């Protein structure tokens, strides 16, 4: 249990440093964290299915400018986490465009191209100003980045991808998130 507490303390301090660089000075002493002001305790706790690991769930949306800015920092930070701590991205799903973007995330994961296409989707929306609100727009983006259109279509229509999108929606509702990016530890 001591290892988990030490990992959690390191995680809290690191998240504070990351957010501090984005949002300005933040006190990092643990006794200055106030429930309801700096964080919320989820009741009941949200299960993440990772055993004894410390899981940082990142709720994001490809259309969110703050998520676009935060993603490179979170990715770099996630690579430095100690054993037993992981970052688990989870697309937020509140409406049809977000559902389409969540499908893009899980299609990339199923096809084994998530590491490559995750930043590409963000760039397409925020740099190239693409909406990516339709199957065709997503398929074209994936095809432009080396994905076979037939494989894309198969994944798009799959029960597995639809199931993952539904699970992401349920996870965000359980966590009671009200905006993106949001983190749950």
Task: Mark where each language-model region is.
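Extracytoplasmic thiol/disulfide redox context detector
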Residues: 2-99, 169, 173
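Cysteine-centric redox/oxidoreductase cores and disulfide-bonded domains
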Residues: 93-179, 184
